[in-house]
Amino acid sequence: MTVLKVKFTKTKRDKLAQILWILNWVSVVSGIILFSLGLFLKIEIKKRNEVMAKGDINSVPNMLISVGVIACVVNFLGGKICYDCSDANKFSRWKLIMLPYIICTFCFTFCILLGALMCYTMRNELEESLYLGLRDAIKFYKDTDIPGRCFLKKTVDMLQIGFQCCGNNGFRDWFEVQWVSARYLNMASKEVMDRFKSNVDGKFLVDGVPFSCCNPSSPRPCIQYHLTNNSAHYNYDFLTEELNIWVKGCREALLEYYTAIMRSIGIAALLIWLFELSVLIGVRYLQTAMKNVLLQGDLQGESDGWLLENSFVETAKYNINIIKNLGKANQISTVSGMNDPNINVQNTNCGKSNVTAKSIPAAS
């Protein structure tokens, strides 16, 4: 039993072909949009790759870029096919190609859906990458003289200023690392040496944060050092007073930023997927309607078009059987209880012969 059968006249077939020709060109534009969105996301990730650990976070932009390029090629070809389908004589040259084209387009639209869903599922991978990357960036913040890390201080400072954040999880992360280079510490000072000896790691740890953590909107001058020491500042209570530094961690700020981008890209990709799916359904109706009109022999008459020739269950069983048969085609099968009668027969040209050769008497 056919699924969603529709009857088409000659006029309806021609209009459907023209509409699909236009929609395929619109789909080329949607492919360019997908490519642009993937490229934009890739650039945004690359901008801050210094504070991200290496991982599979580029899989989403790479998927969108690839799908966008494929969309342009597939829909350009689809536009040409639909344009020729308005003429039954031209359709005959595409007749054998249209069904494989529809199958490939279905797989391609599935990739669009997969790319859209990946925009919503990569949050955990992104969060882990940001956590590890920011942890290392804060750890190496002081290494301004080491090649490969000399610009890391500027990167972290610009990040904290731009995203109004401080530390990885919060400003307390700076309390746990030595973020002041030993080059700028007076080793002859007793206070400095006491700082080094005050912890088992032998690091210069202070309850302070870099200047980039300061909130310029605060009416009070930035309290950058001795944040937990109330007696070090006039009219200051660490527990009750609102601090004039950024409280939000940079991991949370970056995660919110990238999540908002990926959510918008995911919505756009889903809308493009629905549009591509509707175009694919239209192409399927056009293919079946043109195929049936050729079988009838009356190019001006009516013809039926459908989504599936059989029911969903029958179509699924048919495709599964095709896949099974393809797997069995690579295996050598033998009939049960029967052996090849020639399997143990020796070749007469191989090995030594036991027959004694007789000499031929010479003619007298």
From Swiss-Prot:
Glycan-modified residues? N229
**Protein origin, superkingdom:** Eukaryota
Q: Give the UniProt subcellular location, in the record's own words.
A: Membrane
Q: In Gene Ontology terms, what is a biological process of this protein?
A: protein maturation
Q: Which residues face the membrane's Cytoplasmic side? A: 1-24, 81-99, 291-364
Transmembrane ranges, per UniProt, are 25-43, 62-80, 100-123, 265-290
The protein's topology relative to the membrane is: Multi-pass membrane protein
Q: Which Gene Ontology cellular component annotation is one that this UniProt entry carries?
A: plasma membrane
Q: Which residues lie on this side of the membrane: Lumenal?
A: 44-61, 124-264
Per UniProt, the keywords (alphabetical) are: Glycoprotein, Membrane, Transmembrane, Transmembrane helix
The family annotation for this protein states: Belongs to the PRPH2/ROM1 family.
Q: What is this protein called?
A: Photoreceptor outer segment membrane glycoprotein 2
The upper taxonomy is:
Eukaryota, Metazoa, Chordata, Craniata, Vertebrata
